[in-house]
């Protein structure tokens, strides 16, 4: 089924060296109880990435899959892992790594939901939680482990997590996972897995340095790559407001909120101190605001996310911690109070706004100093960020 080079599929929107595209879940040769779980989770037909990636993963092939946020890539490897798990073997068979605790917990929840009718155990091994709970889970036997690199490596090194039966190693958000901050930890974990372990990498962006690193991990991988000019999510309208200087941003934000009616919004800042500053200023103006950043205790972060999901908080202010994988369905507006320092995080941020075709708006506050960075982002994604129109209220009508 694999052909020699990269061939274009689906009017050139997706490139792949694997030519088997499956358009129905019923045709993927999945366990009946997985199909039952898929339909129960709300899927009716596979998304583009699911049509192309599930089959080679379930066949045991190494897969490098690129799909933007909101296309169902988490379910892609969830379905595949559940298919490959031997329910009678109680050892850990699949290891899934994610860059943040929040994303790891979200993945665990998706696995639990889709695997509802299977006899499969899943555990989140993440920093900021009880070490004793982790140890107990590994001692009792867990078949799928979702975790963050630091805690997972610690559990392996302490010999609570036995890796001899691991047959799948999945890295979600690979561009982040293989960045300088995680690369060494990933390598350390990889060296402790069986040589025959299948490797699956999924991400929204695949910079060249990441593609080069995959040669160290993977054996003749199936490549499913979205063309760079297709990375921006459909349904997300992108605008900028030229605020000239940093000091004008806050007044601009308040004016913006006076002009529009939005159910919920996420506002991104680049630093914890900026998040705290903006949160306090908005509360002084009587806005209902929540804030989240990496330095908050895990329990507090969970509570904040729960409140925002329930709708009791209308505005969530965050660092890039939230940009990777938190699924908040009601969000129609994302505001980049600061443009991301790393242009590859831009798509993760604006991807909060319109998942699975839901319409969304992204508004970027741009100082005179930021114009160059905004042009770089446009070039990187082959997209256009247009100036905010005068009648902005019509965008949210």
Swiss-Prot record:
PROSITE patterns per record: DEAD_ATP_HELICASE, HELICASE_ATP_BIND_1, HELICASE_CTER, Q_MOTIF
Matches recorded under InterPro entries: DEAD/DEAH_box_helicase_dom (IPR011545), Helicase_ATP-bd (IPR014001), Helicase_C-like (IPR001650), P-loop_NTPase (IPR027417), RNA-helicase_DEAD-box_CS (IPR000629), RNA_helicase_DEAD_Q_motif (IPR014014)
Motif interval(s): Q motif: 23-51
Pfam families: DEAD, Helicase_C
EC number: 3.6.4.13
Keyword vocabulary terms for this entry: ATP-binding, Cytoplasm, Helicase, Hydrolase, Initiation factor, Nucleotide-binding, Protein biosynthesis, RNA-binding
SMART domains, alphabetized: DEXDc, HELICc
Residues holding ATP: 67-74
Motif DEAD box, residue range(s) on this chain: 172-175
GO molecular function (one): ATP hydrolysis activity
Helicase C-terminal domain boundaries: 255-396
Localization of this protein: Cytoplasm
Domain Helicase ATP-binding, chain residue ranges per copy: 54-224
Protein's UniProt keywords contain Ribosomal protein: no
Catalytic activity annotation: ATP + H2O = ADP + phosphate + H(+)
Predominant cellular place of this UniProt entry's protein: cytoplasm
One GO CC term, this protein: cytoplasm
Family: Belongs to the DEAD box helicase family. eIF4A subfamily.
Quaternary structure annotation from Swiss-Prot or TrEMBL: Component of the eIF4F complex, which composition varies with external and internal environmental conditions. It is composed of at least eIF4A, eIF4E and eIF4G.
Domain text: The Q motif is unique to and characteristic of the DEAD box family of RNA helicases and controls ATP binding and hydrolysis.
Task performed by this protein: ATP-dependent RNA helicase which is a subunit of the eIF4F complex involved in cap recognition and is required for mRNA binding to ribosome. In the current model of translation initiation, eIF4A unwinds RNA secondary structures in the 5'-UTR of mRNAs which is necessary to allow efficient binding of the small ribosomal subunit, and subsequent scanning for the initiator codon.
Name recorded for this polypeptide: ATP-dependent RNA helicase eIF4A
Taxon lineage: Eukaryota, Fungi, Dikarya, Ascomycota, Saccharomycotina
